[in-house]
């Protein structure tokens, strides 16, 4: 068999075994593997001719690569520095690995890696192992699959943390100089799901936020416009909203945008979220409100209360709800008091957001919110919560990050970028940026727009406002 300038000889017995389409397919795969090895060997020969000055070849070393066409055994040359003094261990180089970007100590090629990482966002690692074997791919243990998923998931988590630090620690723009979108209204829905933990802590909370620009009609159903998911394991609500804000800052300029935030009664949503968006409208998710009302006071009374609330009569709603305490059964008092406490603490969050928007937004198609609940169930709970699964902190963070990329249609592009060469550890890069910023005019640095500074009430936010001369009222 000839291929332009190179001649490759194959064992004719490969084709002699062909009896039908299935054996022909296997023969073609075998020929592809032979061709793969032959080309690699020729490339290794060419690299020997142009080896770096001061290096010498000390022999060949074998390694096995698992590819989409099967396992490939590669025998490539090892090079070391040609020094006179012999050291116990000399660090070597495989020029072939460097040229082809073959990852050290990792046997999977990129095509197979993409497949198993994508499958792992939907199936358990053991199920992925079984699926690959049944499909005729090389045997990959569930432990190796777990290792790859964890590695790339944590890389994505580090990249998100890097962006958060760039925006909130340094104050540097993270938009990559792209033209930012300026929608009149942006919708954010937040929720959390508890998953099992392998350590002392019984459960871990995966926080998830969905942002979209509204709805469009597609046939008889409505579809979210430009939905984006941010999900992960965070140390409190502040870290989540800072990470979320950093991701939004890559896409949007929210200076003149009304931000509608919908979520359940969790404090990290109702109390903390408004601190990060100057023009925020926060509402309690209607599903959770109606559900808790029905559980606490019954369906008939809940309906009457919602009629008062939908009419904009917040005070009457809360007063009537409070007056019902004497007739609430003892077994329902806990949920009733929790609901009443929330309604009295956040009365401004009870009205539907559509009742609080100005007349200038009436021409926009506005509908009820609740996408986050569906996203949590479909994207997180199905993979991470059901079937008695439990996770380490790093494992949960990695899986949530990859599920986020998968949901956003970014998983393959992320894997294709080989980000491990760019963001291994964000701290050294952070220190370099801090050093560089220290040589410049600090007044310019402090004038950078940071989402939290215009509406937050935390002490550190007030201090930064004072340093930078922000005009926002405290």
Regions found by a protein language model. Give the residues of each.
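Catalytic center-proximal scaffold of phosphoryl-transfer enzymes
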Residues: 1-37, 79, 83-474
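An N-terminal low-complexity regulatory-tail signal and nearby short nucleic-acid-interaction modules
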Residues: 44-105
């Amino acid at each position: 068999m000839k291929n332009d300038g190179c001649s490759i000889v194959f064992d004719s017995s490969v084709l002699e075994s062909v009896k039908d389409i299935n054996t022909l397919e296997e023969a073609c795969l075998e020929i592809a593997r032979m061709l793969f090895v032959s080309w690699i060997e020729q490339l290794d020969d060419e690299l020997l001719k142009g080896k770096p000055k001061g290096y010498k070849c000390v022999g060949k070393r074998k390694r096995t690569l698992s590819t989409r066409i099967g396992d490939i055994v590669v025998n490539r040359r090892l090079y070391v520095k040609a020094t006179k003094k012999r050291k116990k261990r000399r660090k070597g180089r495989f020029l072939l690995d460097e040229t082809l970007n073959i990852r050290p100590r990792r046997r999977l090629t990129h095509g197979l890696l993409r497949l198993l990482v994508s499958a792992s966002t939907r199936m358990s690692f053991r199920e992925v192992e079984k699926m690959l074997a049944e499909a005729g791919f090389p045997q990959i243990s569930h432990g190796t699959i777990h290792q790859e998923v964890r590695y790339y998931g944590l890389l994505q988590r580090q990249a998100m943390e890097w962006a958060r630090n760039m925006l909130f620690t340094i104050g540097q723009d993270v938009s990559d100089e792209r033209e930012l979108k300026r929608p009149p209204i942006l919708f954010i829905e937040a929720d959390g799901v508890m998953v099992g933990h392998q350590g002392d802590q019984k459960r871990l909370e995966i926080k998830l936020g969905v942002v979209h620009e509204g709805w469009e009609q597609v046939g008889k159903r409505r579809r979210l416009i430009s939905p984006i998911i941010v999900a992960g394991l965070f140390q409190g609500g502040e870290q989540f909203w800072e990470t979320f804000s950093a991701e939004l800052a890559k896409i949007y300029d929210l200076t003149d945008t009304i931000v509608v935030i919908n979520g359940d009664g969790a404090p990290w949503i109702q109390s903390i979220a408004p601190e990060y968006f100057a023009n925020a409208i926060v509402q309690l998710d209607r599903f959770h409100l109606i559900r808790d009302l029905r559980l606490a006071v019954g369906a008939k009374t809940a309906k009457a209360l919602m009629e008062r609330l939908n009419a904009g009569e917040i005070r009457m709603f809360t007063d009537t709800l409070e007056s019902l305490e004497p007739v609430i059964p003892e077994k329902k008092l806990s949920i009733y008091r929790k609901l009443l406490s929330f309604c009295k603490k956040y009365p401004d969050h009870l009205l539907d957001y559509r009742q609080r928007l100005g007349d200038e937004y009436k021409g926009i198609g506005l509908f009820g919110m609740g996408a986050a609940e569906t996203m949590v169930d479909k994207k997180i709970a199905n993979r991470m919560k059901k079937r008695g699964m439990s996770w380490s902190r790093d494992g949960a963070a990695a899986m949530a990050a990859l599920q986020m990329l998968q949901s956003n249609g970014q998983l393959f592009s992320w894997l294709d970028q080989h980000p491990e060469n760019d963001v291994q550890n964000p701290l050294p890069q952070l220190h370099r940026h801090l050093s560089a910023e220290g040589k410049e005019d600090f007044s310019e640095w402090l004038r950078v727009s940071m989402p939290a500074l215009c509406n937050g009430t935390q002490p550190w936010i007030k201090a930064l406002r004072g340093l930078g001369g922000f005009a926002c009222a405290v």
